């Protein structure tokens, strides 16, 4: 009975919080059924949540069908946590336009469009700026590119630092304006108000008084969109390289008796 009580307390007081792309799924692809099944097994021992830069619809598409995601996870934080769901219910939603104001927002959009107009790439497609509630997502190639084009751009970006140079130009142009920039995924980067990185979700979790919040992410180096929450003292950060690595790390921590099976 004592073991059962201890296990019940851990489920209530421990949260595993996961990034989405590269951590639970390949970039912008659906979750593997085996990974999804493992997460539900994990949920029997701890509470689980996701925090992603994408909007809610994209996260829901990757992690389930329709609104399954808010039933399968105790917490869903879309757009770095500016859109928050807890136990299937929408808690709050913030908007970047209300925070920044229209003048700064248009200056930012116009600068990005002008910069990208001068870029010469092997391919350009569509949706270069995606306007989300809590951020702008900027993609030099365009988010409508195919998977093959996404990989091609990613390889070029590693060599020529396309996104890195773009971000440096933005930092210079908008110095002192309260903006932050982070690289995420293979083809884009995010622009958001200072303090609106993935740590934003931790403020709402503070009131739930978890003993431990484990965070798992793949972009945990400086400049990556998981870095701030990974390094935050309120979390125990785990850097992973793939969904399979995420599962293995969780097995080692929460199912040590079966860790050798993976």
UniProtKB/Swiss-Prot annotation:
Pathway recorded for this protein: Nucleotide-sugar biosynthesis; GDP-alpha-D-mannose biosynthesis; alpha-D-mannose 1-phosphate from D-fructose 6-phosphate: step 2/2
PANTHER family associated with the record: PHOSPHOMANNOMUTASE, PHOSPHOMANNOMUTASE 1
Modified-residue entries (N-acetylalanine), positions: 2
InterPro entries xrefs: HAD-like_sf (IPR036412), HAD-SF_hydro_IIB (IPR006379), HAD_sf (IPR023214), PMM (IPR005002), PMM_cap (IPR043169)
Entry function: Involved in the synthesis of the GDP-mannose and dolichol-phosphate-mannose required for a number of critical mannosyl transfer reactions. In addition, may be responsible for the degradation of glucose-1,6-bisphosphate in ischemic brain.
Record keywords: Acetylation, Cytoplasm, Isomerase, Magnesium, Metal-binding, Phosphoprotein
Amino-acid positions noted as binding Mg(2+) 1 in the UniProt annotation, renumbered to this chain: 19, 21, 218
Enzyme Commission number(s) of this protein: 5.4.2.8
Organism the protein comes from: Homo sapiens
The protein, known as: Phosphomannomutase 1
Subunit structure, as described in the record: Homodimer.
Cellular localization per UniProt: Cytoplasm
């Amino acid at each position: 009975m004592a073991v059962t009580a201890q296990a019940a307390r851990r489920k209530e007081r421990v949260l595993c919080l996961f990034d989405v792309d590269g951590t639970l799924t390949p970039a912008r692809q659906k979750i593997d059924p085996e990974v999804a099944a493992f997460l539900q097994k994990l949920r029997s021992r701890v509470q689980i949540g996701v925090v992603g830069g994408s909007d809610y619809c994209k996260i829901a598409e990757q992690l389930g069908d329709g609104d399954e995601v808010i039933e399968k996870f105790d917490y869903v934080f879309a757009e770095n946590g500016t859109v928050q769901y807890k136990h299937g219910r929408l808690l709050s939603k913030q908007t970047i336009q209300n925070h920044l104001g229209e003048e700064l927002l248009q200056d930012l959009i116009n600068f990005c469009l002008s910069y990208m107009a001068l870029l010469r790439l092997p391919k350009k497609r569509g949706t270069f700026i995606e306007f989300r509630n809590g951020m702008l997502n900027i993609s030099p190639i365009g988010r409508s590119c195919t998977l093959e084009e996404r990989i091609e751009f990613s390889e070029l970006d590693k060599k020529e630092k396309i996104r890195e140079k773009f971000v440096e130009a933005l930092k210079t142009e908008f110095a002192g304006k309260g903006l932050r920039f982070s690289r995420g995924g293979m083809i884009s980067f995010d622009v958001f108000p200072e303090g609106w990185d993935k740590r934003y979700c931790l403020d709402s979790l503070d009131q739930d008084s978890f003993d431990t919040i484990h965070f798992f992410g793949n972009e945990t180096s400086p400049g990556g969109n998981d870095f701030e929450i990974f390094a935050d003292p309120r979390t125990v950060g785990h850097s992973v390289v793939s969904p399979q690595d995420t599962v293995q790390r969780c097995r080692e921590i929460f199912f040590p008796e079966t860790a050798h099976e993976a």
